[in-house]
Swiss-Prot record:
NCBIfam families assigned to the protein according to its UniProt record, in alphabetical order: PRK13529.1
Gene3D superfamilies to which the protein is assigned, alphabetical: Malic enzyme, N-terminal domain, NAD(P)-binding Rossmann-like Domain
A GO biological process held by the record: malate metabolic process
Residues annotated as binding NAD(+): R154, D267, N411
Coiled coil regions, renumbered to chain: none
Protein name as it appears in the record: NAD-dependent malic enzyme 2
Origin: domain of life: Bacteria
The keyword Nuclease appears for this protein: no
Chain sites annotated for binding a divalent metal cation: E243, D244, D267
Site positions (Important for activity): D267
Pfam entry (one): Malic_M
């Protein structure tokens, strides 16, 4: 009946036990448990295994044709029986990943108030400032080890979604568990409800958030500071992941807190790590080094610049000087190529701007366009976060680069710069591609091209597992670089010349294990974690890796 012989002693019984999603087993409660936990008559007579339950749940799932309906159905299982939820995802991860996260989660965030069923996590409203410590004590889960937090201002490519952004922390933490084996009992999604500037939400009678323009400036900073201090007091060893903060706040918050608490920003650092991992794999498949590439970005926000800085760091590790590495990076935004004579560049953009004297001849009549950059700079890599890749741009790139590396990273799918089928057709099948959203394999000239999804889920679950297992107190740039290196080593295309740039999702547990070990070892090496041998770290990682299995229950007094 039970795959795990461990016994759990519980004081809960009756409806209270059935309503606890972490403990509920539904029809899998044994006759003895039904008797001892006052469940007699509360469940149908059949005693089922989790395998039988999973088969029924999947059969029900298949009756839905609409992705949003599938998302709502899975979220309902998550809120009633988390063990079954993760068993279902484990067995169908490639099919269900796009449903529980991108691209479907984007629509779920937009419709959050309309599809709301029950609360999950914490909603920290600005009117509650001064009481955040007390609110954290209200959390249903007390042993919190990983927090994902958003303020809902920049949700995917969809902009300000207010508290609808809560769908992102919920989805990200589901992937921490499904991909990285983090016990769901140790996770907590949080949204900072500081208002919204989305007029549609403010006028929507169904909107469930605080109806107020967004708090900004010092008031905003003070509210975030109160949250950070409250977490340090309540869960001093928790890992905090910042998620989908607007550009004006994302980098400043990361810089303010990265050396004070164990935290990272997935949009900046996680996206950078998975992108560098994809590039390292592509370079290996093409028989070159990353330091040999010339890289153009379409989009010069915090995410794009974060990726660029990670690439610079890797190029330096391969032997280039800082200036030589930066000379190979071309950042293009809606005004054209970023150059050092432009006004109003943000701090993180200034370091990546090209010297105007070097590129002034590329367009003497105005701003330097993407096509100008491709024609004159002759990039071998094109990355969009987000942007627009036209046929003319891709074909011009292919004219001087036999195997161009093209990464259209925008999500959800509706926002992608160019589809893989177009890119493959425009390059006669020569392009190496990884996308931000999932795409089916492309058939061109009777050959099938699997499309890798450059998804942060390859990175952050392993980072979380490595941080928890090692007891790391910080997330360093070197730990993130290790995760990129390990991901590249897992690439099927780099290993044998066949397959996608990144490993299939069915192998995600193995990938997360490998990344976790590399991250943990680097944390120990940098004295950010207690000294442990590799064997001890492996044992820790295995002990932290939660599996969706039912345990035996014994009743104990309150």
């Amino acid at each position: 009946m039970y795959e795990n012989n461990k016994t759990l002693y519980l004081p809960y019984a009756g409806p209270t036990l059935l309503e606890n999603a972490l403990l509920n087993k539904g029809s899998a409660f044994s006759p003895e448990e039904r008797q001892n936990f006052s469940l007699m008559g509360l469940l149908p007579a059949a005693i089922e295994s989790i395998t039988e339950q999973e088969e029924r749940a999947y059969s029900q799932y298949q009756t839905f044709n609409d992705d949003m309906d599938k998302h709502i159905y899975l979220r309902n299982i998550q809120d009633t029986n988390e063990t079954l939820y993760y068993r279902l995802i484990d067995n169908h991860i490639e099919e269900m990943m796009p449903i529980i996260y991108t691209p479907t989660v984007g629509a779920a965030c937009e419709q959050f108030s309309n599809i709301y069923r029950r609360g999950r996590g914490l909603f920290l409203g600005y009117p509650d400032k001064g009481n955040i410590v007390d609110i954290l004590n209200n959390a249903a889960r007390q042993d919190v080890k990983i927090i994902v937090i958003t303020d809902g201002e920049r949700i995917l490519g969809l902009g300000d979604q207010g508290i609808g952004g809560m769908g992102i922390p919920i989805g990200k933490l589901a992937l921490y568990t499904a991909c990285g084996g983090i016990n769901p009992a140790n996770t907590l999604p949080i949204v900072l409800d500081v208002g919204t500037n989305n007029t549609q939400l403010l006028s929507d009678p169904m909107y469930m958030g605080w109806r107020h323009p967004r708090i900004t400036g010092q008031e905003y900073d003070d509210f975030v500071e109160e949250f950070i201090q409250a977490v340090k007091s309540r869960w001093p060893n928790a890992l905090i992941q910042f998620e989908d903060f607007a550009q004006k706040n994302a980098m400043p918050l990361l810089n303010r807190y990265k050396d004070k608490v164990c935290c990272f920003n997935d949009d900046i650092q996680g996206t950078a790590a998975v992108t560098v991992g994809s590039l390292l794999a592509a370079c290996k498949a093409a028989g070159s080094e990353l330091s040999e590439q010339r890289i153009t970005f379409v989009g010069a926000g915090s995410a794009g610049c974060g990726i660029a800085e990670a690439i610079v760091a890797q190029m330096i590790a391969e032997g280039l000087s800082d200036s030589a590495a930066r000379a190979r990076i071309f950042m293009v935004d809606r005004w054209g190529l970023l150059t050092d004579n432009m006004q109003n560049l943000l701090d993180f953009q200034q370091k990546l701007a090209q010297k105007s004297a070097t590129v002034s001849q590329w367009n003497e009549t105005g701003n330097i366009s993407l096509l100008d950059v491709v024609s004159n700079g002759k990039p071998t890599v094109l990355i969009g976060v987000p942007g627009l890749f036209s046929q003319e741009v891709i074909m011009e790139m292919h004219a001087h680069c036999k195997r161009p590396i093209v990464l259209p990273l925008s999500n959800p799918t509706s926002r992608v710069e160019a589809t893989p089928s177009d890119i493959i057709r425009w390059t006669e099948g020569d392009a190496l591609i990884a996308t931000g959203s999932p795409f089916d394999p492309v058939i061109f000239n009777e050959k099938t091209y699997p499309i890798a999804q450059c998804n942060n889920s390859y990175i952050f679950p392993g980072i979380g597992l490595g941080v928890l297992a090692s007891g790391a107190t910080r997330v360093t740039d070197e730990m993130l670089m290790e995760s990129s290196r390990v991901l590249a080593e897992c690439s099927p295309l780099a290993q044998n010349g066949n397959g996608a740039l990144l490993p299939p999702l069915k192998d995600i547990h193995q990938v997360s294990h490998c990344i976790a070990l590399a991250v943990a070892k680097k944390a120990v090496e940098q004295n950010k974690a207690p000294q442990r041998t590799e064997k001890q770290l492996l044992e820790k990682i295995e002990s932290y890796f939660w599996k969706p299995e039912y345990l035996k229950y014994k009743r104990t007094a309150l």
